[in-house]
Amino acid sequence: MLKRKTFLKKKANLQQSSLSRNLRLRRLKHRKQQQFSRHSLQFVVQEICC
């Protein structure tokens, strides 16, 4: 009985961790995309400038 309880607990933790991991990944990808767009914009501005 004790073993089963810990197993269930672990399963819940796993789900939670995967959820947080997905959120973190999504945020990271979003930041990368924003940074990339900002970078490309900067290059365009540089080309217009010089």
UniProtKB/Swiss-Prot annotation:
State the superkingdom: Bacteria
The molecule here is called Uncharacterized protein HI_0233
**Organism field:** Haemophilus influenzae (strain ATCC 51907 / DSM 11121 / KW20 / Rd)
